[in-house]
């Protein structure tokens, strides 16, 4: 089953758009988890098992694993394996934000889509279309291009306007994506940009948006849901998995995910 089918089936079944991010920042892990031989695997498994009833997708962030070198990569692969073996119906978005020359990009695509078999990943568009094409060859998978991100300094580049076209950089990213038009290319649009999100959604009614920045970064569901549309994944990471740093961290993650799920479910029919 391709990414779009898995996403739509899961989203419509749960009547939700919740993507649970997995950012296992070691410094913030509960002490009992830090004593585990594989703390990142232990923590992520607990969070996954606690939130699976409410997750439309999971988004593990590679940076929190890479910091531990080869051990971290092995733990990342085990987390992916846990998801694929136990929750094959839930799509995986590998948050890697790569962007490199086509020959290098081909190696990334082979590892993440070929070997790990993640359903989707995030890429930077900065180096152009030739860095994207090796990923699009895996037609059952989906690529999320960074379009307009939620960090405050994104305006230094992403909202600058091209004199030749009158479009901003983020608008240019969307324009180029539409010029090649495959629907296995989606956009990352930060939750803190609700005005631009609404415009992008009207221009791209059928593209899937990955929307980070909800929860810990301050964006609110009441602002997002009226403008994002059903073809969206609204991500919450820290707000769910670091709801508690005590022994009840998994139970609290379950409660936070359920709370978001219920809020989305109540509004889903209006999306």
From Swiss-Prot:
SUPFAM superfamilies: Ribulose-phoshate binding barrel
Domain of life where this protein originates: Bacteria
Chain segments annotated as coiled-coil in the UniProt record: none
Active site: 97
Protein's UniProt keywords contain Lyase: yes
EC number: 4.1.1.23
UniProt entry keywords in alphabetical sequence: Decarboxylase, Lyase, Pyrimidine biosynthesis
Catalytic activity: orotidine 5'-phosphate + H(+) = UMP + CO2
Molecular-function GO term, any one: orotidine-5'-phosphate decarboxylase activity
Protein name (database record): Orotidine 5'-phosphate decarboxylase
Source organism (scientific name): Leptospira borgpetersenii serovar Hardjo-bovis (strain L550)
């Amino acid at each position: 089953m391709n990414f779009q089918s898995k996403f739509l089936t899961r989203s419509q079944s749960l009547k939700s758009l919740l993507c649970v991010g997995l950012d296992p920042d070691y410094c913030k892990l509960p002490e009992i988890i830090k004593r585990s031989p594989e703390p990142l695997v232990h923590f992520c498994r607990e969070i996954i098992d606690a939130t699976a009833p409410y997750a439309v997708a999971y988004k593990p962030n590679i940076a929190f694993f890479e910091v531990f070198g080869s051990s971290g990569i092995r733990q990342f692969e085990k987390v992916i394996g846990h998801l694929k073996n136990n929750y094959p119906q839930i799509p995986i978005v590998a948050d890697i934000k790569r962007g490199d020359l086509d020959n290098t990009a081909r190696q990334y695509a082979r590892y993440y889509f070929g070997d790990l078999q993640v359903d989707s990943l995030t890429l930077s568009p900065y180096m152009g279309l030739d860095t994207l094409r090796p990923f699009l060859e895996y037609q059952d998978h989906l690529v999320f291009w960074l379009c307009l991100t939620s960090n405050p300094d994104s305006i230094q580049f992403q909202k600058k306007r091209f004199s030749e076209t009158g479009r901003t950089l983020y608008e240019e990213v969307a324009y180029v994506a539409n010029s090649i038009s495959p629907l296995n290319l989606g956009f990352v649009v930060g939750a803190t940009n609700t005005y631009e999100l609404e415009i992008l959604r009207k221009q791209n009614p059928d593209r899937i948006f990955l929307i980070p920045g909800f929860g810990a970064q301050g964006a609110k569901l009441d602002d997002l849901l009226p403008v994002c549309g059903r073809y969206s994944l609204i991500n919450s990471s820290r707000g769910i998995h670091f709801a508690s740093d005590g022994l009840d961290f998994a139970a609290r993650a379950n409660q936070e995910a359920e709370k978001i799920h219920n809020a989305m479910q109540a509004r889903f029919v209006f999306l």
